[in-house]
């Protein structure tokens, strides 16, 4: 729907804002959940809040009106109805990049407590969301100018640096607690900028690889790679933590 209603000349910018809402939600969710948990709220109540958010999302989606689009005749069962074959290399790359994202959103709070960062770790996701919002200032327009791979490479470099610094916190905290805490939240900001410019650029890349009648398939491939990568990150992170 988003792809069909925006002009192609501003596709990168539009998909950037669309992706921003998804990424920020992935940051706000853990932050809100951690704040509730640290405040003594039961897990049952936390999941009730999650259910309420889902119901609001469903209500909002049901209010969206779109112009009629005639169906495209295809084979009843075919792989290209679900996966954009031309986008498989990009899908594998996105999957691998989503694995550390899944690990971070689920286990960074445990990591902070384990190394001795005594602060509200939920603010990590606040700064991450701020970083993602900052990324929208420039990345969408760069993508619209055709610099998709350059934007992805820049985001990747920022993410690599942020994970290196995150791993270094275990040593820095032995030297200075306050400096480590500041760095910890600075890492979240940097990581948010990195992921915030990469993921929408990937979405635009998938759409550009597909013909007009396969834009939905392109977005499906993008989201499948994203979801599978995050799932692998959660499982792998849990296995490593145990």
Each model region followed by its residue ranges:
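Cytoplasmic helix-loop-helix junction between adjacent transmembrane helices
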Residues: 1-20
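Small-residue (Gly/Pro/Ala) motifs that create kinks and tight helix-helix packing interfaces
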Residues: 25-37, 233-241
């Amino acid at each position: 729907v988003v792809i069909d209603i925006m002009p192609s000349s501003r596709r990168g910018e539009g998909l950037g804002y669309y992706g921003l809402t998804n990424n920020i939600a992935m940051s706000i969710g853990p932050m809100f959940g951690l704040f509730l948990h640290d405040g003594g709220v039961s897990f049952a109540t936390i999941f009730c809040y999650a259910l309420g958010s889902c119901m609001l999302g469903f209500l909002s989606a049901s209010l969206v009106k779109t112009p009629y689009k005639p169906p495209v005749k295809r084979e009843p069962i075919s792989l290209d109805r679900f996966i954009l074959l031309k986008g498989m290399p990009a899908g594998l790359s996105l999957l691998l990049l989503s694995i550390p994202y899944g690990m971070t959103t689920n286990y960074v709070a445990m990591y902070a407590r384990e190394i001795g960062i005594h602060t509200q770790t939920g603010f990590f996701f606040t700064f991450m969301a701020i970083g993602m919002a900052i990324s929208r200032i420039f990345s969408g327009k760069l993508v619209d100018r055709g610099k998709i791979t350059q934007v992805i490479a820049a985001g990747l470099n920022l993410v690599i640096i942020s994970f290196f610094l995150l791993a270094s916190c275990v040593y820095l905290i032995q030297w200075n607690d306050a400096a480590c805490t500041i760095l910890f939240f600075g890492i979240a900001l940097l990581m948010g900028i990195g992921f915030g410019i990469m993921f929408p650029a990937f979405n635009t890349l998938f759409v550009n690889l597909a013909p007009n009648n396969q834009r939905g398939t392109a977005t499906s491939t993008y989201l499948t790679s994203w979801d599978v990568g995050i799932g692998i990150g959660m499982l792998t992170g849990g296995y490593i933590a145990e």
